[in-house]
Amino acid sequence: MDSEKILNAVKEARTLAKPRNFTQSVDLIVNLKELDLSRPENRLKEQIVLPSGRGKDVAIAVIAKGDLAAQAEEMGLTVIRQEELEELGKNKKTAKKIANAHGFFIAQADMMPLVGKSLGPVLGPRGKMPQPVPGNANLAPLVARFQKTVSINTRDKALFQVYIGHESMSDDELAANAEAILNVVSRKYEKGLYHVKSAFTKLTMGAAAPIEK
């Protein structure tokens, strides 16, 4: 899709949203066509680094012990230690709250079997299974990448809606993020953007603005 048409849709989305007393998110909505999504190879399951970033921090939880847990605490991340992990396995309601409150999870590699048992049933369906790292890992680069990353997982639905920033970002920044996501879709399929039936940009409380093809 043409960069200028994406930019025009971002601008139009702003005009379709009334001012609110909070900062509204901006999403990209994409409808797909002529894809057999019962075939796993046709499904979109991607983590995409946004060129303009997310515009605001995303909550990250680290499941760890020892030095890695201490490092995560120093970085101001949510830390889930082994004993807490075991308790979450017994309390699905609390586990769901934690899953919904965090965009990404990181886990110490040797704790992954326990993670799968305790949190797997909650994180798996949300596409939030943790990124495993060794106990001596430097978390900073991974956290920095996650702070610019969004996830797409269509499963069996021919539609996805994904965050591209918020209204305090510039039109150019938002359009660049939308274009990066559409480029991933284009590279995924042999026929590229032919499989995009329609695409829109939208603020939280506004109507959807179509991206002209």
Curated annotation (Swiss-Prot):
SUPFAM superfamilies: Ribosomal protein L1 (SSF56808). The keyword ATP-binding does not apply. Keywords: Repressor, Ribonucleoprotein, Ribosomal protein, RNA-binding, rRNA-binding, Translation regulation, tRNA-binding. Coiled coil: none annotated. One of its GO terms (molecular function) is tRNA binding. It comes from the Archaea. The keyword Metal-binding does not apply. PROSITE patterns: RIBOSOMAL_L1. GO terms for cellular component: large ribosomal subunit. GO terms for biological process: regulation of translation; translation. Belongs to the universal ribosomal protein uL1 family. Part of the 50S ribosomal subunit. Binds directly to 23S rRNA. Probably involved in E site tRNA release. Protein L1 is also a translational repressor protein, it controls the translation of its operon by binding to its mRNA. This is Large ribosomal subunit protein uL1. The gene is rpl1.
